[in-house]
Amino acid sequence: MGVVSSQSFKNLISTYAGFSIGALNVLILYPYFLSQEYYGLVTFLLSAANLFWPFMAAGFHNAIIRFYSAYQKKEDKDSFLSFALIVPLITGSIIGLASWWLYDYILAYFSDKNQLIQPYAWLIVPLGVLNAYFEVFYSWAKVFLKSVFGNLMKEIFHRVAITILLGLLYYEWIAIENFIYYLALIYLLRVIVIGIYALQVYSPKFQLRLLYNYKLVLSYSSLILLAGFIAVALFDLDKVMIEYYMPVENVPVYGIAVYIAAVIAVPVKAMNQIAKPLTASYINEDKLDQLEDLYQRSSITLLIISGFIFLLIICNLDQIYAIIPEEYRGGYKVVIWIGLIKVVDNLLGNGG
């Protein structure tokens, strides 16, 4: 547990730092610096992009963690990573072409209500591709037990950049109409940085050759694609559905409540960045005793931490909502129910 404890602690610090900066953005800067409609637009676009990226990654971000340590030959490892690099490009191109062909129908979908989304709807697919590539490169680094920098990029980088962007908007150095485009550039820059880092950790010789276990990889990736979409859908589909049934300004009301409850998930997220690659390694090397010990320790530790955080949030929920503009309040029950779900996620430990 030495490597797990060390990197989990560093990831926990960076993740909570990221959540703190995110809380500043979500609870204070967004509500006060953006209109409720534009805040809803930002929440909707990012949530919609999150629904697409599991299809674009096609499960390969998890397949890297699961199978990389199983390959013994450099040629197999390089070919495997090469496939992982081109998969988001292929799937993103297919989805992008389909979106282009259906673009008029997409615009018509937003014509009756929420017309504010129309000029920015095309950004959903590129943002999805960027998220997919980020996860692939991050998994790339994690299999070499280099999770700390990637976690900084995942949790802190874009949130700090968004804080700066909101400051520029407040001082009218950028126009509100261009805010979304600058936001997309932040996600592009994040992918470039993590991509350079991953290639510095290990730079494969690009080659595409049929892997001896390609059927197993494809079946696992397909399963992860489905599981990954369900996991993301549980977090973001509701925000997209709210846009469908209600005006877009209702999206951030729900989004704020979800964000408050999501703080409870930070411990398990931090531990999984390093524990998941170790789990795959133990499975591949048939070290079942060590795997069982890892599961038990992670479950007990995460339950204690997450339970404490849940109680802390519930006991101070009135004070938290007091700092938010009145029109964004009203998600008390959402915080409680989603918070309980996050505690259960932590209880499952690394096995979840």
Question: What are these model-predicted stretches?
Answer:
Residues 1-4, 116, 176-182, 192-235, ...:
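Interhelical loop/hinge segments that connect adjacent transmembrane helices in multipass membrane
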Residues 3-62, 92-100, 127, 163, ...:
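Signature of the first transmembrane helix
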Residues 5, 130-154, 339-352:
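Membrane-interface junctions at transmembrane-helix termini in multi-pass inner-membrane proteins
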Residues 6-18, 45, 54-104, 119-122, ...:
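Membrane-water interface segments that mark the loop-to-transmembrane alpha-helix transition
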Residues 46-54, 231, 254-273, 305-309, ...:
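Transmembrane helix-bundle signature of multi-pass secondary active exporters and lipid flippases
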Residues 57-72, 143, 257, 261-299, ...:
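Helix-loop junctions and terminal segments of transmembrane helices
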Residues 105-124, 248, 313-345, 349:
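Interfacial segments at transmembrane-helix termini and the short loops linking adjacent helices
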Residues 122, 152-200, 220, 258:
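Hydrophobic alpha-helical transmembrane segments
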